[in-house]
Amino acid sequence: MIDIQGIKEALPHRYPMLLVDRVLEVSEDTIVAIKNVTINEPFFNGHFPQYPVMPGVLIMEALAQTAGVLELSKPENKGKLVFYAGMDKVKFKKQVVPGDQLVMTATFVKRRGTIAVVEAKAEVDGKLAASGTLTFAIGN
């Protein structure tokens, strides 16, 4: 398990863009983390005031950050950054609303040099909320 302090050591993101609260499981190529979604999230002020829904692009960002924690926690990547290089096969299946807990899983399926491909999914109450294939570049 990695707490918020460990996450902040791995990722450069800070409020309001830090979207990973805790890491539950870590292995060589897979990480499982959570994001507790509250009504206090700044994006709910405008998306949508009468019916708050977490923007899908921020769910994908949370998944990217989850993968980033795994990659940037490795000694050889200390102090580096992870940049989006692409997203494929992204699907949104369930709305994410205040009070939900996103359980995010990211599995690295391919690495070549500084490029990595990740299969990622976010679930709420065991139901798929979003999924996709994310491509990253690791750099300074």
From Swiss-Prot:
This is 3-hydroxyacyl-[acyl-carrier-protein] dehydratase FabZ. It comes from Streptococcus pneumoniae (strain Hungary19A-6). The keyword Lipid metabolism applies. GO terms for molecular function: (3R)-hydroxyacyl-[acyl-carrier-protein] dehydratase activity. The active site is at residue 47. One of its GO terms (cellular component) is cytoplasm. It is found in: Cytoplasm. Keywords: Cytoplasm, Lipid A biosynthesis, Lipid biosynthesis, Lipid metabolism, Lyase. PANTHER family: 3-HYDROXYACYL-[ACYL-CARRIER-PROTEIN] DEHYDRATASE. It holds the Pfam family FabA. CDD domains: FabZ. One of its GO terms (biological process) is fatty acid biosynthetic process.
